Amino acid sequence: MLSVEGVSFRYAGGEEPVLRELSISVPAGGIFGLLGPNGAGKTTLISILAGQLRAASGRVTVDGTPLEELRRREPASLGLVPQEFAFYPMLSCAENLRFFGSVQGVGGARLRERVAAVAAFARIESMLARRAGELSGGLRRRLNLAIGLLTEPRILLLDEPTVGVDPQSRSFLLDSIRALAGEGRTLLYTSHYMEEIEAICDRVAIIDAGRVLRDGALDELLRDEAAAVPVRHNNRSLEALFMHLTNRSLRD
């Protein structure tokens, strides 16, 4: 269980906090979705969980162990697939994978094995000799995913992993993420695309302005709101629920 309790954060010079005593509980295994518009605080929370930012207050634990302690003790246990492209465009795909693997403590024969394994999983084997900067948007997203999997993390943070890709690449990435959950990993998935959240997530937290508006199993959320949100469970139901809670669209 990944537990986020009362986490708040404000950027230096910012007038308003980005996260406001935000709490979620992510069960082990499966895919937990964070759904919210741009600026809701999704990326900030991911950055805190990844150790890139420090929360002003609150605590984060994994099975009762403080996240900072877990990162020190088991740095390979948590992986990150950021929204930005996390590689060097002038290096080849293979060079990027070897570099980031070594930075994360993977070396020797295991590094060679992991590079081959993640390249095969992301289906970029034929691209390993090409410079990362020459790849299409969809292939860059696949390389991003491959880098995040190098350490075989049991918890994977995915921040808008399908942004800017064509429908075919999006379908491949979503299928790949489902496969990872099938291997028993715990995935935290952020998006402002409600159709993606509905397609792959077991549980959902709808957030806005740094606060959790609703949190629960997808079917439970829709059933509980059925009286207030007169829509069927289709690809617009989560957006309708969000609009009911905030009086605005996810795309605002």
What are these regions (language model features)?
Residues 156-160:
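Catalytic Walker B motif of ABC-type/P-loop ATPase nucleotide-binding domains
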Residues 50:
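Helix-to-loop junction immediately C-terminal to a conserved catalytic motif
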Residues 215-216:
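ABC ATPase "signature
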Residues 131-138:
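Conserved ABC ATPase signature
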Residues 58-69, 73-74:
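Conserved ABC transporter NBD signature motif
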Residues 98, 102, 109-127:
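Conserved ABC ATPase "signature" region
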